[in-house]
Amino acid sequence: MITLEQFKVGRSDYIDQHVIDLFRQDSMLLDRLVFDDAMIPGTGGTLAYKYMREEVPAEAQTRAINTEYTPQEASRKEYSADVKIFGGSYQIDRVIERESGIASEVAYQTEKKVKATCNLFHKTVIQGDSDTDTNSFDGLDKALRGSVTEINANGMIDLSSAAAVDENYKIVMDWIDETLSELCGRPAFIMANTSMINKMKSIARRAGYMTRSEDSFGRSVDGYDGIPFLDMKYYPTKEADGSYTEKPIIPIQTRAINNKEVAGLTDIYFPVIGRDSFHGVTVKGDSFIKQYLPDFTKPGAVQKGEVEMLAAIALKSTRGAAVLRNIKIR
């Protein structure tokens, strides 16, 4: 298992280290996630990581003299996560780079490409579905559907106004306690969209549960009872007319609740990071994160640069992550 910080230590090139830090700065998820880096590409160019997910735990019993235990077995099921290649390329004219001075165009484009890669990884961690997109792995929304850690799947909690927050914040706290009790450990984050994070801060302030810590770069991070909030932010979508709209990575949707359409519903995710719960996957060696800078010493007016990350996620136990469904925020 390796973290991005540990992966950075093994890189001797300063630019490589800087690009890795850009990923860590832009994504607290990537910064704190541990990755199994033992995956070796198979034949045929596959990057499949197979693992077992525990679905039914073992039970212990007491028995009377001259009686037998009732047989019961823990059960697990094989799953596969295909490591995906995230990244992108950009092109820069050598004149633009030469005249950009201290505000390097290469540095600017690299930083923006890292941010876009982090956004896509966040989106895939939540919304990924390998059945509908072969370039994706299965995200938490799909993995937790129908599991014991999918909480409030058929109910609804109203936080759509300040008055509703005043009335219902204790109910939300009870549901959070219920969710946390289903996990195999303490979650690393409370993952939600921006609007839901703001609602959670309101609840934490009302309850006296607002806490504050620092990330790896000394930046302040708010949390709920010591669990940091992780804003999964937005993902830009290109429309038919060429314009871009940004939509929350954890969506705000209209859903059917008790045979009635309810708008403004969203979810909160609680991942427990660890070898036997929820972790990342990458390949063995130095290909985890790579950058390829434009080489303006070569012929050609326009040179290309690229940023690339090889990653997937694995949920080793159904209690390694949880989702609290159907919170109305609009």
What does each model-identified segment do?
Residues M1-E246, T254-R330:
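Flexible, glycine/threonine- and acidic-rich loop/arm segments that mediate assembly and lattice contacts
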